[in-house]
Amino acid sequence: MVSKLDKYWQHPALYWPLLILFAAATPFTFAPYYHFWLMPLIFGAFVRLIELRPRFAVSSAYLFGLTAYTTQFYWIHTALHDVSGLPDLYAVPLTFLLPAYLALYPALCFWLWKKFTLPRGIKIGLVLPILWTLTEFARERFLTGFGWGAIGYSQITPDSPLAGFAPLGGIHMVTLATAFLGVWLVLASNNTARSGKRLLPIILIAALLAAGYTARQTDFTRPDGSRSTVALLQGNIDQTLKWREDQVIPTIQKYYEQVGKTTADIVILPETAIPVMRQNLPENILAKFAEQAQNNGSALAVGISQYTSDGNGYENAVINLTGYQENNQDGIPYYAKNHLVPFGEYKPLPFLTTPLYKMMDMPLSDFRKGGGKQSALLMKNQKIAFNICYEDGFGDELIAAAKDATLLANASNMAWYGKSNAMYQHLQQSQARAMELGRYMVRATNTGATAIISPKGNIIAQAQPDTETVLEGHIKGYVGETPYMKTGSSWWLMGILALAALILFIFRNKEH
């Protein structure tokens, strides 16, 4: 099949359009579409195209990445233009800026790949998936990191056996498995190969799927016997109105009424639900929230910004109002966001970006980090490891807190991105974290996707996006550690890097 297509695919009139087409199809492999089976086919077709014209490997990989990331993250334009009011003259080129940077990583992967002089089966079937995974890992770490769009996320769905690798080695192991499946499909479908060479990748594919399925059925963590009801508040506050002074009282009143309508054990408000600095609020406001929750038998967590303890900055926090007493503001337990969004929550290049911030009239764009390991917040009978906004896109950073927690919780405000796919892509990342860490993940968001996710990554309840609502459901506390929690990503990634180096060393010695 592949050999018959090759003569058409390598023609310049088809090669570049096909490359763009395959890349543009990648968003359909992620949430909200969940066509997980499509990603290995796309990746395999992409690799086969590059095989046909290896001279253009680096430029082809860059174009593929640029197209894929632009179509996946089109919602950047929504945030810049539709919400922040930046004119298209600036919003359009800035929308391409992040994909243009991210595309450097696929290009780097194939630049390194071209350096290997190896038999095709090893170069395609082993080395390439390793290099792809390592460069994806680098993309998540370098310059604060941005791991959205890693091909492994396409498999985070109940139907994909490859999702079973998440609790074993995290999302990057799922990425490695997805890349392996894609290239082994190419090797298995090669009509010119001898039957023996075609049989090996078929066996490897079967073994890979079986291993993933088996891991998916394995319970690495266990319930601790505790059960709780949770209420996740979704205020549906328009981002263009959120920080206006005339909307502060209506917003506070809305959430106060929502808190009063639920008798759940644990009640969680979204990120920056209260659009005022905590220390600037009249103390009786928080006291009333705490009293309202206490009267209903609830523990209450609220997303709010607050000044740092030294008073020299501010931080994005979730405060635990359980047992709150008026006149004791300094004694409030809280979690403060540690992994900040560059250009959104702090200014990495203030001399360049300050004029843009003024044009967009962005509030609170210079947050401070909350610090390294922070204690889980005790709410009723659950120890909750909170993360805020896109922090749940970084699995390794959540491990330490998760070890001491029975429940994971994310507080977010995705109103910046309107009705785009951003909220669903973010939800899929939370599904991955639940699987990696073997615990329930609850998500309280302003506009969506508010949800309850099981330790297997299944969405067991979800609120209708872009509506004012309260999502209620049941969760269990979980304890124990997945294999991923014991080692993180770094150790096994160093192992496959060493394997790639060993392969190169062996074959170079054979040449000499």
Swiss-Prot record:
PROSITE patterns: CN_HYDROLASE. GO terms for cellular component: plasma membrane. This is Apolipoprotein N-acyltransferase. Residues 233-477 form the CN hydrolase domain. Its main location: membrane. Belongs to the CN hydrolase family. Apolipoprotein N-acyltransferase subfamily. Catalyzes the phospholipid dependent N-acylation of the N-terminal cysteine of apolipoprotein, the last step in lipoprotein maturation. Its EC number is 2.3.1.269. The keyword GTP-binding does not apply. The keyword Cell inner membrane applies. It is a multi-pass membrane protein. It is found in: Cell inner membrane. It is an enzyme of class 2 (transferase). Pfam families: CN_hydrolase, LNT_N.
